[in-house]
From Swiss-Prot:
This is Endospore coat-associated protein YheC. It holds the Pfam family ATPgrasp_YheCD. Involved in sporulation. Belongs to the YheC/YheD family. GO terms for molecular function: ATP binding; catalytic activity. The gene is yheC. It comes from the Bacteria. The lineage of its organism: Bacteria, Bacillati, Bacillota, Bacilli, Bacillales.
Length: 363
C-alpha cells in the first residue's frame, strides 16, 4: 500500500479537509497520514505521524518512513515557526525517496514578473513594482492618484493598504478584521516616516482597481483548477467572493460571502459577459500551463480575477495552495471531485512510477 502524507505546520490545520481525504483514501489503495515538517527525524529519516484508521474513524500515532508521496499544505507567515519549517520542506523536495503531488509557487513578485513575459497573459497583469523605497511610492502615487500596497508574501487580503492622493493630504486605508481603518497624512514628511516603517517588510505596488459592484461590495472571481490524471488542467469550480460593503477586497479571511458565478454573471451587462467569458477562457488555457512549465509540476491552483469598474479583466492573485470553502459553498455537488482529486493524483503518480519499475518502500 502506498502512503500519502498530508503535511502542514500544525496537525490541527485543515483538520476537516484532511479527514475528508483520509476517509476516501482506502478506496484508492492509499494509507493516509498527517505530519508536520518538525515530525521528521534527520538522524533516522523517519517521521512521527497520525495515521487514519477507517474501521474506527480514528487517528493513531505511529512512526514510519518518510511517506512515498507528500501533499504540501504548509502556509508560511513571518513567525519563527514558519521560518524554521521552510528549509526542512526544501530539503524534502530534494529527498529522492519521496515525491510531492504538486509543487508550490515562489513569491508573488517572481510569479507576476514571469507572467508579464507571456504575450497572452501580460494584458491581464496590473502594473506591478517591487517597492523598497519611499521615492518609488511617491512617484507611483503622484502618477496614479490611488494605488495598492500588497505584502509580497501575504495571503487572504491581510496587510493590503490603499493609498490615495488628495488635494491637501494622503490617506492610507486598510482592514483590521471587519473594520476599515484610515490614517491621514497632512504633509510628505509624516507620510515618508510612515512609509519607511511599512517598508521594513517586502511590499508590491499596483494601481488601485475598483472592483466594487453596483451595491458597493468588492467582488472577485475564484477559479479553482486541478490537474487531472492525464495532466490536463480543469476548472473544477467558479465562485464569486463578495467582501464588506465599501471594502477594499473580496478575499478577506473569514469575511467574504460566496455567490454562484451564474447568478452574479447574469447581473452584468451583456457586452461584458461576452468579454468576460472570452478572457476567462484565455486565462485558464494559458496561466496553469505556463506556471507548470516554469515551476512545476503543479497540481492545483486558485486563480483570482476581477471585473473592474473600467470593464477590464485583471488577475489579482494566484495561489498554489488554494482553499475550497467558497467553491463548496456555491457548488456542494463538487464535493467528491474536490476530496478525491488529490488521491487520484497520488494514484496516478504511483502508476507512472510502477511502469518504470519503482515500487513503494516498506514503512
Amino acid at each position: 500500500m502506498i502512503t500519502l502524507g498530508f503535511m502542514s505546520l500544525s496537525r490541527q490545520h485543515e483538520a476537516d479537509y484532511s479527514a475528508e481525504l483520509a476517509k476516501r483514501a482506502p478506496e484508492f489503495g492509499i494509507r493516509f497520514i498527517r505530519f508536520t515538517p518538525f515530525d521528521i527525524s534527520p538522524d533516522t529519516l523517519r517521521v512521527k505521524a497520525s495515521v487514519y484508521h477507517s474501521a474506527s474513524s480514528t487517528w493513531n500515532e505511529t512512526e514510519m518512513a518518510i511517506p512515498d508521496y507528500i501533499y504540501d499544505r504548509c502556509f508560511y507567515g513571518k513567525d519563527s515557526h514558519s521560518q524554521k519549517a521552510k528549509p526542512i520542506v526544501e530539503w524534502l523536495k530534494k529527498y529522492p525517496k519521496t515525491e510531492f503531488i504538486g509543487r508550490g509557487l515562489p513569491d508573488k513578485w517572481t510569479v507576476l514578473h514571469d507572467l508579464q513575459q507571456h504575450s497572452v497573459i501580460n494584458p491581464y497583469i496590473p502594473e506591478t513594482i517591487k517597492v523598497s523605497r519611499y521615492e518609488q511610492i511617491h512617484s507611483f502615487l503622484s502618477k496614479e492618484k490611488a494605488c495598492i500596497l500588497k505584502p509580497a508574501f501575504g495571503a487572504g487580503g491581510r496587510g493590503v493598504i490603499l493609498l490615495k492622493l488628495g488635494k491637501k493630504n494622503i490617506t492610507a486605508t486598510y482592514h483590521i478584521g471587519k473594520d476599515k481603518q484610515t490614517k491621514t497624512f497632512s504633509n510628505q514628511t509624516s507620510f515618508k516616516t510612515w512609509c519607511k516603517k511599512v517598508l521594513q517588510h517586502q511590499y508590491l505596488l499596483q494601481p488601485y482597481l475598483n472592483i466594487q459592484d453596483k451595491e458597493q461590495y468588492p467582488c472577485d472571481i475564484r477559479l479553482f483548477m486541478e490537474k487531472n490524471e492525464a495532466g490536463e488542467w480543469n476548472t473544477v469550480g467558479k465562485a464569486v467572493r463578495r467582501g464588506y460593503k465599501h471594502g477594499l477586497l473580496a478575499n478577506l479571511s473569514g469575511g467574504s460571502d460566496a455567490l454562484t458565478f451564474d447568478s452574479w454573471f447574469e447581473d452584468i451587462p451583456k457586452k461584458q459577459q461576452v468579454v468576460l467569458l472570452d478572457d476567462v477562457f484565455s486565462i485558464t488555457q494559458s496561466v496553469p500551463y505556463y506556471l507548470d512549465e516554469r515551476y512545476g509540476p503543479l497540481f492545483e491552483l486558485g486563480l483570482d480575477i476581477c471585473l473592474a469598474k473600467d470593464g477590464r479583466i485583471w488577475i489579482l492573485d494566484i495561489n498554489s495552495k488554494p482553499g475550497r470553502k467558497s467553491i463548496l459553498r456555491v457548488s456542494p455537488e463538487q464535493k467528491e471531485q474536490l476530496y478525491t482529486c488529490p488521491l487520484k493524483r497520488c494514484q496516478y503518480l504511483f502508476s507512472e512510477q510502477s511502469q518504470k519499475g519503482v515500487l513503494p518502500r516498506e514503512s
